[in-house]
Amino acid sequence: MDRAVNEEEAAAIHKTVAETPRVKSVHNIRTRKMGDMIVAEAHVEVDATLTVEAGHDIAVEARRRVMQRHRALNLMTYVDPWKRPDLDHGAVLQDKRSPTG
């Protein structure tokens, strides 16, 4: 059965991601031990005016840094726009085609 890493290791991974150049913020980090290795995921917030390519490059760099500095098999990253509401989680989007939209 898998389990999360200890708080110290999770904080260290968070710090590594947060210190990646051009990452504005990090949230929703999840970790799992897989044997003696770590599988993690994180939402990274980047400047909303960047291109998709630039946002992807930042996420790739965050992943590289985590895999280099920690016993990580993988870091799955989700790129979110910085300082914008997260419309994916918790908010209801109103359909513009509806009579009330």
Predicted regions and their residues:
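Alpha-helical transmembrane segments and adjacent TM-loop junctions that form the membrane-embedded core
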Residues: 1-101
